[in-house]
Amino acid sequence: MAKITKTFQYGKHTVTLETGEIARQAGGAVIVKFDDTVLLVSAVAAKSAREGQDFFPLTCDYQEKFYAGGRIPGGFFKREGRATEKETLISRLIDRPIRPLFPEDYKNEVQIIATVMSLNPEIDGDIPALIGASAALSLAGTPFKGPIAAAKVGYKDGEYILNPTVSELKESQLELVVAGTANAVLMVESEAALLSEDVMLGAVTFGHREMQKVINAINELTVEAGTKPSTWEAPAKNTALISAVQEAVGPRLGEAFQVRDKLQRRDAISAIKKDVVESLAGRVAAEGWNPAELSKEFGELEYSTMRNSVLDTKVRIDGRALDTVRPIAVKTSVLPRTHGSSLFTRGETQAIVTITLGTARDGQVIDAVSGEYKENFLFHYNFPPYSVGETGRMMGPKRREIGHGRLAKRGVLAVMPSLESFPYTIRVVSEITESNGSSSMASVCGSSLALMDAGVPVKAPVAGIAMGLVKEGDRFVVLSDILGDEDHLGDMDFKVAGTAEGISALQMDIKIEGITEEIMKQALQQAKAGRLHILGEMAHGLTAPREELSDYAPRLLTIKIHPDKIREVIGKGGSTIQAITKETGTQIDIQDDGTIVIASVNAIAAQAAKARIEQITSDVEPGRIYEGKVAKIMDFGAFVTILPGKDGLVHVSQISSDRVEKVGDVLKEGDVVKVKVLEVDKQGRIRLSMKAVEEGEGASAE
């Protein structure tokens, strides 16, 4: 196939899609050029599903190569290793809008690989990767109901910005990624500076409107490439099996869904399924039915039973109304030796959140393609198997945990103090101890309380809520504070975090082929009411940060010295700074601009270290009297240390008003004496006098 190219303007950027020259053995492959950021995105689908495959095995891998930024990776092996947090998050970002656009019965393995091969530091790889994934899938001839497109939206001075650069995002009040088809939105991911619901909805519609040119370009590329439509057909429904399962279940599933307790409800449904399997075992064998199909049909019946019930009755499976939030309980200072902690419980979802305060050196150094930087606000989310009453392997964080942690971090980021005003590295850890839906939003609420408990000067309390949707045709209901089953059996997971003032984070994932602006508007308004209710409940714990830090948290003292004096504080081979830290028990960080941060749990020790540094960096003042220690005796006088690292000479003629024949007769090394500074010459040599002090001249040094 000859090389085919499509070029269009997308905001301020020129975008080019190329296919037919590179990776020609892949099902579909596209080079995406977004100005100087260049990605190769491939899509390959297996010819058939594996035997017994009962889920859609879609894998999305986003990878950034260090050569893209003209850098060599660090570490011993000098090559890219396991996926970074950023790569994991963008891999999830690609997966989320693509997965719902494959047919329910399609079980062939599909893999999308997006590789950043050239990186302009001003243009991130997320939007090009999403565009490339959509184009590659469209070219691969899969039963993909796309194409989709994506846009990044910023907001400044009341205006939306399409695909802002990295520099523009630093000044923006919003960073929002929206993806969707020509007709509907499928996914939203955002971080905001406490913006209103109307501004957020406007950003989504703005992004969706602007992305139409991308969809048109992909359609044109696919036509010119002569891509053949997919020949895959969904397997025929086994109507006899479906009728048999429905008859065997009867009204029992509807009754099971009335059980309020999650574990009891699961047990009741499992008992019904077991009975159905046993009662139909003979017929399954006689008819040659696949047992996996029976299990699948039972799941379909679960799905329709719950959905029809809530649509018809407007009552949910735990008895709540559509907009009711589960009971909330909050506690703070639950762990005595942590710097801050909270216990947040909402129904059967629970999180213990802890705060640890450290110094700037405790920040995480990240070796990125665009350059090395340090992260001083860390948010870690852990989801152990016991939280849902299961067993499982305890390994490193999975993709889901990394994604949920990032969302919760976005939720509180807007209220965090700047590093200049609160120079601590802050680590938040959310341990999910129970889960029945919305654990990431429980982490937002719990972290807000724990941060205030730690005395971190956050601007306002933050709460989060997860919304759901059940939609059949023109009928739909929006659910507040969804359960795990409502998430699993519903059509939308819509999470909103924010303060009483506005939204700080919004994430939306749609399992159907998009939702309308009307549904989004209702969900946002319902989420606001729920968020305000939760904030009211959280106020029973704390409403503002504590005035004092924990007794176990480090106290930070910040002083500023002239950069030229840094080497005096460090000393030869680090001797001076090591002596101060050892003798005072403090931790000292020195920055290139002369900022010195002293950390110590003991405030007195921190003050002592500060005094030592001020002594070292202070200038010797002519005419001032100092108390010093005799450092060395010479025939012509004595050297006296008046400040750390600063020695001056008391000439034999300046020791006393009386005649001194031999210096050693009057002074010995280690003697403490008062001296007056007579002169500091151009070479920095200091002339001192004891005689002048005797004669009562000069001012006494403090």
UniProtKB/Swiss-Prot annotation:
Pfam families: KH_1, PNPase, RNase_PH, RNase_PH_C, S1. Its EC number is 2.7.7.8. Its cofactor is Mg(2+). The keyword DNA repair does not apply. One of its GO terms (biological process) is mRNA catabolic process. It is an enzyme of class 2 (transferase). Its main location: cytoplasm. Residues 623-691 form the S1 motif domain. Residues 554-613 form the KH domain. One of its GO terms (molecular function) is polyribonucleotide nucleotidyltransferase activity. It comes from the Bacteria. Mg(2+) binds at D487, D493. It catalyses: RNA(n+1) + phosphate = RNA(n) + a ribonucleoside 5'-diphosphate. It is found in: Cytoplasm. One of its GO terms (cellular component) is cytosol. Keywords: Cytoplasm, Magnesium, Metal-binding, Nucleotidyltransferase, RNA-binding, Transferase. InterPro entries: ExoRNase_PH_dom1, ExoRNase_PH_dom2, ExoRNase_PH_dom2_sf, KH_dom, KH_dom_type_1, KH_dom_type_1_sf, NA-bd_OB-fold, PNPase. The keyword Cytoplasm applies. PANTHER family: POLYRIBONUCLEOTIDE NUCLEOTIDYLTRANSFERASE (PTHR11252), POLYRIBONUCLEOTIDE NUCLEOTIDYLTRANSFERASE 1, MITOCHONDRIAL (PTHR11252:SF0). Involved in mRNA degradation. Catalyzes the phosphorolysis of single-stranded polyribonucleotides processively in the 3'- to 5'-direction. Belongs to the polyribonucleotide nucleotidyltransferase family. Component of the RNA degradosome, which is a multiprotein complex involved in RNA processing and mRNA degradation. This is Polyribonucleotide nucleotidyltransferase. The lineage of its organism: Bacteria, Pseudomonadati, Pseudomonadota, Gammaproteobacteria, Lysobacterales. The gene is pnp.
